[in-house]
Amino acid sequence: MLKTHHKNSRGRLVDTFSGIVQIPVDSMHLEAEWIMPPNASGIVIFAHGSGSSRHSRRNQFVASVLHESGIGTVLLDLLTRQEERRDAADGQLRFDIEMLTNRLITAVRWVEDHPAAHDQPIGLFGASTGAAAAIAAASILGERISGVVSRGGRPDLAYEHLRHVTAPTLLIVGERDDAVVRLNKEASQHLRCLKKLSIIPGATHLFEEPGALEKVSSLAAGWFKKHLARETRQNEIHREVVEV
């Protein structure tokens, strides 16, 4: 990764390590954008949703807010460029949750072993079908994942994994995304970990309404900042909160 400079929200020039990395998966490589702000307290790996990629404006925005909170990010493409073209035509790969989960797990292990990770705690952020992969990966990796956030996710697609998740999990949905609200409420009942369902007033599935994505980003940053701290993870109390 390369050392670069940028101004933080206070206008101060700070050092950031960033770059495009190639993560080996089976006989191919997946591309990811890895950014580590100064004195990062953890790393969040993004699993993008249906028809999306690491260039997603929404996930890029969420990632920038995490950087301001001192959290590194890995925006991962779970499909190769060739697969993305095929998926754009038939939409099948984006719903292959088992494949996406296996690739995400491989990416987590690769990041863990990378010298730049510095043994930082790892969280997962998933959107749409990527949220199902994040939840499934968290259930399989167990204590190696310190927190999960789902944005407009489809946790129902990882139904058999829900009760095995141990990482604190935040489900964020838009109030006007009726079907996804219902699916997330049902999924929340099957989670046995510390969990929270946050419903953003007036928001639809893509959180395009004024202030909606900012609220999502703030919630995600707060969740990861709290739960990626090792001392917090050791004293979690299992409970459920629903917020509107």
Language model feature labels by segment:
Residues 20-117, 209-211, 215:
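Serine-hydrolase catalytic machinery in alpha/beta-hydrolase-like enzymes
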Residues 116-128:
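Alpha/beta-hydrolase fold nucleophile elbow
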Residues 128-131, 153, 176:
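Active-site loop->helix "elbow" adjoining a glycine-rich segment at hydrolase catalytic centers
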Residues 165, 171-173:
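Short beta-strand/loop motif that positions the catalytic acidic residue
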Residues 178-183:
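Conserved alpha/beta-hydrolase "acid-adjacent" motif
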Residues 191-206:
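Catalytic histidine neighborhood in serine/cysteine hydrolases
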Residues 211-244:
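Catalytic active-site module of serine/aspartate enzymes centered on a nucleophile-bearing elbow/loop
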